[in-house]
Amino acid sequence: MSEDNSQGRDYTLESDSELRFEIEQKDVKVLVTLVNGFAELFGTELVKKKKYEFGMGAKVAIFTYQGCVLHVQGKMDVCYVSKETPMVQYVNCHAALEQFRQEAEEKDACGPVAMVVGPMDVGKSTLCRILLNYAVRVGRRPLYADIDVGQGAIAIPGNVATILIERPASIEEGFPKTAPLVYHFGHKSPSGNSVLYNAVVSKMAEVTLNSLSGNKRTQSSGIIVNTCGWVKGSGYAHLLHAARAYGAKAIFVLDQERLYNELLRDVPPNVHVVLLPKSGGVVERSKELRHESRDQRIKEYFYGNIRAPFYPFSFEVKFQDLRLYKIGAPPLPDSCMPIGMKAEDNKTKVVAVTPTQSLLHHILALSFAENTDDDVIGTNVAGFCCVTNVDMDRQAVMLLSPQPRPLPPNALLLWSELQFMDNHA
């Protein structure tokens, strides 16, 4: 039900309740001000008397433990106050993780790795944000690992990534995405190349776990891992693989009892598996909306947003100067493979790509690997560019890039199935 608060309206929230609203229309903004009391958005505290602006696509749930008054101005598609909220259970999860962190601190050991799992559209990314914010608010510096290649909470979709969280997320923009550790996968779902997906998850887990020992505060703070919404069949096998790779101490299962019971059966008994309800404010997204969300993430990578716009560069690169590869060769039966190789080895093979018109609109990852003799899969990426034109007559491509020309020396580019139509004026 649409609600027009053009003149502004005050909402009085009782303790342990939340104001939820959604904005679906373009060119609409909603301003929210905390008038009195205490309130938070996904674990980040609102500052009293400060105006917060939300635009199209916003799905907001402002929660209060003690009660508050919020002033809201603008047109929303949905707006209501709810007392039915799982926030108390979520803060209990934070308290349990904090206990593990204190034990790790005393023993000079690594803090807990907590995985958040569940089907699509149950609020996994939101729970990760809440747990990370609560950790930072008590002085921790956790790592945030995102292995959901479909949406991309840290890097653009089609990649796995990790960042260090040192301060609470901004109310309007989330966590700063500075200096992420990013590994190229190149597909929208782990099903695009299951062998490669497990390989990049294992590599990122190895690197991040090793990095914990470099800083005592981060070491005891541990890691929060956000996962894909594919939880059946091979998707479930990927979850088990990630739990082993990271040595998960806790697995928080959102809104699916079947998955909870399967994990109880299959993970070691020292792993704490906890079933949690999803929030009533979680919105189920259509395929079209998920596609739009992916496009928006890629657009923000190149162009930023209204508050912090970026101005990318376009430049031409000749085919002869393009060192372009993809990971994964077409499948062959075992009988056709060289002696000692299996068919699945082809899934991680680095194959040269000949530029053709089919490259148009594809995302390319710029690897830190300098040649294919390096461990390309196990080498992180520096950034991304997009093919905006392919000129077969001139044997050249036009690239959209955050950095000006030229490409770095020995630049090795990795093909991704992700595409972006650059319609930016």
Swiss-Prot record:
GO terms for biological process: mRNA 3'-end processing; tRNA splicing, via endonucleolytic cleavage and ligation. InterPro entries: Clp1 (IPR028606), Clp1/Grc3 (IPR045116), Clp1_C (IPR010655), Clp1_C_sf (IPR038238), Clp1_N (IPR032324), Clp1_N_sf (IPR038239), CLP1_P (IPR032319), P-loop_NTPase (IPR027417). GO terms for cellular component: mRNA cleavage factor complex; tRNA-intron endonuclease complex. The keyword NAD does not apply. ATP binds at E18, K59, D121, V122, G123, K124, S125, T126. Pfam families: Clp1, CLP1_N, CLP1_P. It comes from the Eukaryota. GO terms for molecular function: ATP binding; polynucleotide 5'-hydroxyl-kinase activity. Its main location: nucleus. Belongs to the Clp1 family. Clp1 subfamily. Required for endonucleolytic cleavage during polyadenylation-dependent pre-mRNA 3'-end formation. This is Protein CLP1 homolog. It comes from Drosophila willistoni (Fruit fly). The gene is cbc.
